[in-house]
């Protein structure tokens, strides 16, 4: 069983590597590669030739549909590459290349290939499933199965409704899942990653893929009138192109800031995985690709919760659905639409699925009272006013009392290679918050480092702190300090 799993992972990694290399080759150079293979390579490398043929066909198809700016997706490429590779033949005596392709009428494709890959001839067969008794039985089977899936969907909705009914039910559910992760995982890296995935998807009402695709270079500290400060990061790749994810102080066990702090201590930066033929718009993503499947498998096997026992039910993506339902129960339907990246509005440059089901405009930031409500520090009135649940527990006052860490070497040791990529002011706030909330901050004293020129900052002065950190260490290593939206790289 383990051997099969390892083989599958190895195959996926090889396919991703092949696609990345192929994507670097320009379209006209792809044609030259095809001619070179047909002229010089014997025996014929079918996989290699099929890959080049697939890429130029998909590129040409997108261009003919006036979708020149739309990239070739890796999943689409693999689907058609497999079909061509299985049926590819080459007759060197007549210089004829033949294969099957998913088209009703391949005549235009044949003419196009013969024009650009001259003097070779092409025979393209129509790839169709056989129309036999089995296909008809399968159609009936699918119709009946669809009816059962509707029943399954109703069951999923019922379970989500139960979890999202009250504050106690939703955060109690999250707490029990956190206990499960703590008890049933042995590796600290896995424990930290699962906890971040769980807590951040619930607190952000977001798809697990959105969290995974977060660009860690874009983390920034932003002010909030109800919570003091929070972290925000940009997600370049979503169903609609753009969105933010947020990490903010929370009153209960579920605290995305603490989860993020732990995760960054146990993991190194994860290079961005290439999913289209275009260069990635950013270098590092927050979570590794395989984590979502790993989490799904863990939860389905280890948890006794009814929602996780439903075949093909949501697991890594559950937080998005539950939190949306929870906000709706508290008369925040519109807020859930914006925060969760849902709507029926249409935008330019997004897929038809996205246009039909999703909308998110980056200029529309979620209202502060939404974070206040989810944090557990506040109750929200009908007029959207925020009232402290406990007057003695004021997050803004707590934020003012957080002693800021002034030793950059402490931060480098705490976050490892992440400290070379994530803006330093973000790590200053994150580490200071985590120490303070974990009661380490009460005993943590900021001492002047005269030898390095780093003073104490009793007023938590943000600009003074970052300027001092920069001045003290600029000669020792190159560090990017991000303050607001200005970047100073020395």
Curated annotation (Swiss-Prot):
Domain of life: Eukaryota
Any Pfam family hit: Flp_N
Active site: 358 (o-(3'-phospho-dna)-tyrosine intermediate)
Domain Tyr recombinase Flp-type: 152-437
Keyword Nucleus: no
Keyword line: DNA integration, DNA recombination, Plasmid
Single GO MF descriptor: DNA binding
UniProt GO BP: DNA integration; DNA recombination
KW Cell membrane (keyword) present: no
Function per UniProt: Catalyzes the recombination between the large inverted repetitions of the plasmid.
Family membership: Belongs to the 'phage' integrase family.
Full protein name: Recombinase Flp protein
């Amino acid at each position: 069983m383990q051997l099969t799993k390892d083989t599958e992972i190895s195959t996926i990694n090889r396919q991703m590597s092949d696609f990345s290399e192929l994507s670097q080759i320009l379209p006209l150079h792809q044609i030259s590669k095809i001619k070179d293979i047909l002229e010089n390579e014997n025996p014929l490398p079918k996989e290699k030739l099929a890959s080049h043929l697939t890429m130029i066909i998909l590129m040409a198809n997108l261009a003919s549909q006036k979708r020149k700016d739309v990239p070739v997706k890796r999943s689409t490429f693999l689907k058609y590459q497999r079909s061509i590779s299985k049926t590819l033949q080459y007759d060197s005596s007549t210089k004829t290349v033949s294969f099957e392709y998913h088209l009703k009428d391949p005549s235009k494709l044949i003419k196009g290939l013969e024009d650009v890959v001259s003097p070779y001839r092409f025979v393209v067969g129509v790839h169709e499933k056989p129309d036999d008794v089995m296909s008809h039985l399968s159609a009936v089977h699918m119709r009946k199965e669809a009816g059962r899936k509707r029943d399954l969907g109703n069951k999923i909705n019922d379970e989500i409704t139960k979890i999202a009914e009250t504050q106690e039910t939703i955060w109690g559910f999250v707490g029990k899942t956190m206990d499960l992760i703590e008890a049933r995982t042995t590796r600290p890296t896995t424990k930290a990653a699962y906890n971040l995935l769980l807590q951040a998807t619930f607190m952000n009402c977001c798809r697990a893929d959105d969290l995974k695709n977060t660009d860690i270079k874009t983390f920034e500290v932003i002010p909030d009138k109800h919570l003091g400060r929070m972290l925000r990061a940009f997600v370049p790749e979503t169903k609609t192109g753009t969105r933010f994810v947020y990490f903010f102080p929370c009153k209960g066990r579920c605290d995305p800031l603490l989860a993020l702090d732990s995760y960054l201590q146990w993991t190194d930066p994860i290079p961005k995985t290439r999913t289209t033929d275009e260069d990635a718009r950013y270098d590092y993503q927050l979570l590794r690709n395989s984590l979502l499947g790993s989490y799904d498998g863990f939860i389905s096997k280890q948890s006794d919760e009814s929602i996780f026992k439903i075949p093909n039910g949501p697991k890594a993506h559950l937080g998005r659905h539950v939190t949306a339902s929870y906000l709706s129960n508290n008369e925040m339907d519109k807020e859930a639409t914006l925060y969760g990246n849902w709507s029926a509005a249409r935008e330019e440059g997004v897929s038809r699925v996205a246009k039909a089901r999703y909308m998110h405009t980056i200029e529309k930031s979620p209202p502060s009272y939404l974070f206040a409500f989810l944090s557990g520090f506040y109750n929200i009135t009908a007029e959207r006013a925020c009232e402290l649940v406990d007057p003695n527990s004021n997050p803004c006052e707590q934020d003012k009392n957080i002693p800021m860490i002034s030793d950059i070497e402490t931060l480098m040791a705490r976050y490892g290679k992440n400290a070379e990529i994530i803006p330093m002011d973000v790590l200053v706030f994150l580490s200071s918050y985590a120490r303070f909330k974990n009661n380490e901050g009460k005993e943590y004293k900021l001492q002047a480092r005269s030898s390095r020129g780093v003073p104490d900052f009793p007023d938590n002065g943000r600009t003074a702190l970052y300027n001092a950190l920069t001045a003290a260490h600029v000669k020792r290593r190159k560090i990017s300090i991000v303050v607001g939206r200005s970047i100073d790289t020395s």
